[in-house]
Amino acid sequence: MTKLRGIFAATMSILNSDLSLNVDKTIDHAEMLIDQGCHGTAIFGSTGQSQLIPISEKIDLLNKLSKSKYKDKHLIGTGLNSLGETINFMKVASSLNFKKFLIMPPAYYKYGDSEVIEFYTRIINSIPKCKIILYNFEKLCGYKFSVE
């Protein structure tokens, strides 16, 4: 896998009036960012309301995004607190040949270094060919990564 370089813009999740994910408009927005010069996008980060989008709608988007001409230019955020759901979602994404992920430690509970390391270790052991960007957003997850 090549090293990620460049600007990866956070994408918005476009919602329908019933608050369901508008898959087509969300993908159009992401592709527009690339057309405008970004090297890639981060889908389902905090700007993309990842914590609020149902897994089934995320999977619907991934199925359609897997056919995009820019497929290899997207980081896929998980936005899930459950380790098992994170791994299962990543396995679905991996089956569609998405390999780059943006993963924040679980939110709400206070975690120490050993618990966060264990969280990422289990993900890597379950999906060894994935490339992970550590999502360092202390305000949202309550954990601050150290340089060690």
Where are these regions (language model features)?
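Active-site beta->alpha loop and helix N-cap motifs at the rims of alpha/beta catalytic domains
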Residues: 2-144
